[in-house]
Swiss-Prot record:
Coiled coil: 117-140
GO cellular component entries: cytoplasm; nuclear membrane
Quaternary data: Forms homooligomers, independently of the DNA-binding domain.
Membrane topology: Multi-pass membrane protein
Organism from which the protein derives: Rattus norvegicus
A Pfam family hit: TMEM18
Membrane-spanning parts: 26-46, 53-73, 92-112
Taxonomy of the source species: Eukaryota, Metazoa, Chordata, Craniata, Vertebrata
Annotated protein name in UniProt: Transmembrane protein 18
Cleaved signal peptide residues: none
InterPro entries documented for this protein: TMEM18
Motif Nuclear localization signal, chain ranges: 130-138
Family: Belongs to the TMEM18 family.
Residue ranges of the region described as DNA-binding: 113-140
Length: 140
């Protein structure tokens, strides 16, 4: 008898993936904890530029490897999951693994753009002050 959570033909739509997933599985809870830790590291690394670069690169590499992770998980799903979630299209791995990692990467890029704009603004203000000082010296 099939469980209401069993997936024979994996749905294509995101709401269907969310509804048909058994979110109480330990490996999914562990993945959720991993994503929360990544989000915390993203937030707390804002003042540490080198740490943030390393974190960003790790996120991008993990997203790049998602296809390979999906293939390995599809072959070995019985070792850690109740149901086969890993389809050839990669919808499930994209939703539960790659999307949160890409969100973190996007937050980091937004932080970098904001920081760059702040530095550019500060530089422009400094240039204006220097220009004003030079102008005053010439008037004297």
């Amino acid at each position: 008898m099939a469980s209401p959570y069993s997936v024979r033909v994996f749905p294509v739509s995101i709401p269907a993936v969310i509804m048909e997933t058994d979110w109480t599985e330990p490996w999914l809870l562990g993945l959720l904890a991993f994503h929360l830790l990544c989000l915390l590291l993203t937030c707390f690394s804002a003042q540490r530029y080198k740490l943030q670069i390393g974190h960003f690169l790790c996120l991008v590499v993990l997203v790049y490897c998602a296809e390979y992770i999906n293939e390995v998980a599809a072959m070995n799903w019985r070792l850690f999951a109740k149901y086969q979630y890993f389809d050839s299209r990669g919808m499930f791995i994209s939703l539960v693994f790659s999307a949160p990692l890409l969100f973190n990467a996007m937050v980091i890029v937004i932080m970098w753009v904001r920081k760059t704009l702040t530095v550019m603004s500060d530089l422009k203000n400094l240039q204006e002050r220097r220009k004003e000082r030079k102008r005053r010296r010439k008037e004297e």
